[in-house]
């Protein structure tokens, strides 16, 4: 039994060591997109509540997530689908304009769905959030 264990260690230890040196695996696109969906929800409630600093934070986080997707998977599909809508959301946030925010947010959501269709994931349909899943976070502005 001991010789078998020794042979196993000799055979597989270099593989295990090599994998350990590579560092952690990058997140899967499904993990990034799950986080993007949470950011999308928070962005809506922040803008809808007029919490412009939080909305600004969430749109920046969304942009970072989309950059992660582009870095890992290449191409410019995401940029083509959501680049202009993100800019419109940023402009509405800067202007503190709820009506413009709502329209820009809806275009961003449509851009997300357009990207899903382009990547053969049309079964994933994002919409404007209808309820707040974060009962532990206030989206009201701090006075």
Please place each PLM-identified region on the residue numbering:
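Bacterial N-terminal signal peptides
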Residues: 6-15
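Positively charged n-region of N-terminal signal peptides that target proteins for export
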Residues: 1-4
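Short cysteine/histidine-rich metal-coordination sites, predominantly Zn2+-binding motifs
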Residues: 126-136
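The canonical Cys-X-X-Cys-His
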Residues: 108-119
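Sec/Tat signal peptide C-region and signal peptidase I cleavage site
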Residues: 15-21
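Amphipathic, charged alpha-helical scaffolds that flank and support histidine-based chemistry
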Residues: 48, 52-55, 82-108
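Immediate post-signal-peptide N-terminus of mature secreted/exported proteins
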Residues: 21-53, 58, 140-143
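Short, well-ordered alpha-helical segments
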Residues: 72-85, 124-127
């Amino acid at each position: 039994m001991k010789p078998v264990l020794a042979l196993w260690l000799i055979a597989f230890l270099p593989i295990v060591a090599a994998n350990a040196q590579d560092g952690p695996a990058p997140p899967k696109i499904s993990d990034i997109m799950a986080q993007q969906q949470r950011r999308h929800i928070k962005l809506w409630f922040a803008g809808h509540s007029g919490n412009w600093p939080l909305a600004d934070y969430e749109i920046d986080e969304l942009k970072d997530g989309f950059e992660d997707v582009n870095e890992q998977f290449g191409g410019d599909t995401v940029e083509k689908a959501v680049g202009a809508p993100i800019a419109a959301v940023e402009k509405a946030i800067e202007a503190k304009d709820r009506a413009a925010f709502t329209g820009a947010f809806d275009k961003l959501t449509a851009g997300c769905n357009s990207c899903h269709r382009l990547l053969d994931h049309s079964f994933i349909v994002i919409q404007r959030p209808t309820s707040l899943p974060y009962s532990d976070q206030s989206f009201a502005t701090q006075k």
